[in-house]
C-alpha cells in the first residue's frame, strides 16, 4: 500500500526552491499541489503557460512510488522528461520511436522501481508488455495524470480510441496491488467547456474530484477574424499580415498536410524562409523543424494541429489560422501559444465569405467534417450488430480490423462498458449518438460570425460568466 507523504508545507516549498529555484507557488499552484499530495481526484483547467507541469511533477517527486503521466504527443513527453533529467530527477518515457535498447533500459528501471515519473501515451500504457510490468504487485503506483485531457474529448471518438479505455485503468491496477493501495487521478487541460469537463470526469470515473478552473482570458492576445473573398485573396491577406511584421516569430495553422506543403511552397516562392510541419514527417524531420523554430533559424512554421503542444516559446508575436479549426477548444489551445511573455500578440483567423459562392473551401470542409462524423456512427452501429456482446479488444480487432474506433463510439453512445482496459460488454445494440463534436463545430462557426466581443464569447463558451457590459477592448469587434 502507499506510504503517506509526511513532509510539512515548508518542506514542499523547500523542494520547489531546490528543484526549480522558485521561492513560492503561483496561484493556484499551491492548492493543486496540496490536492495531489492528499491523493484526491482532480480536474484542472489551467491556461497554457500557467505552470501546470510543476503541479503534478512536484507531488510525484515527493513520493516514494511511481506516478504515470499519460500524454498525447512524443514531443510533449520528450520536452518535459528532458527538463526533469537536467534537474537530475528520476523520470523516463516510453513511446514507439525509442530504440530497442532505450525501451529496455526504461522497462528495467521501471521493474527496479527506480522511477518517480513515467511518461507514456494511452496506447503504450495499454500495450501488453508495459501493462504486465505495471500490474506487478510490488510496483507502487501513486497516481495517474492525464496531461492535455481535452484530447480525450477531441480524439477519443476518432483516431485515438485508447483514450476511451482509460477509465478502466485504475480499477484494474488496484486489483493487482496490495489491499489499501490508493491511486488518484488528475486530469489537466488548458481548455474544457462544461460539456467536455463532464465527459472527462465520466470517462475517467473521477471520484468526487476537486475542480480548479482558471479563467483563460489573456489581455495581451488580440483576436481578429477577416473574410477572404477568394482563395487568392486569402493568400494575399496572409502575405500582407506577415509583411507588416518583419522579424517577428509566428505560427500559421492549416487543416491538412497538403495545405501545409502547398502554402509553404507558395511562401517560399514569395521569399520567406519557412517549413511545413505535419504528422506525416519522420520523427527526425519534426525535431529538426522544432529546433530550427525554437532556435530562431526560421521565424514561422506552416503547421497542422500536430505542432505546438508542449513546445514552449515565449516570444511568439502572432498566430494565423489560415483555415479555422473545427473546434473552439483547438482554437483556444493554438492562440494560447502566442504572447506567453506577456507582451502583445496578434491572432488572426481567415474565413471564406458566408455564402461560399466565391470561395467554397470552408463550407466544403465543414460539410466533410459533419459527413465523416455521421459515417463513423453508421459504421459503428453496423459493427455493433456483428460484434460479440462480450469480447477482448485485441481478439476483436484481428477479426474486425477497424473496430477500435467503433468500440470507442459505442462507449461514447452509452452502448458499451469497459469491464477492464481490454474487455468490453455491449449492453445495448442501439444508442443515441452524442452530438459533442458537431455541437462544438457549430459553436466555432458562431464564434467566427459573432458581432459581440470575441473574448466575451470565448469566456461564456467555456463556462465563465461575464457582466453584460464587459468588453475586452482589444479584439476586432471591440475596435482594436
Task: Please place each PLM-identified region on the residue numbering.
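Conserved nucleic-acid-binding Ia/Ib motif block in the N-terminal RecA-like helicase ATPase lobe
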Residues: 68-69, 74-120, 273-276
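C-terminal helicase lobe
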Residues: 249-253, 257-259, 265-282, 286, ...
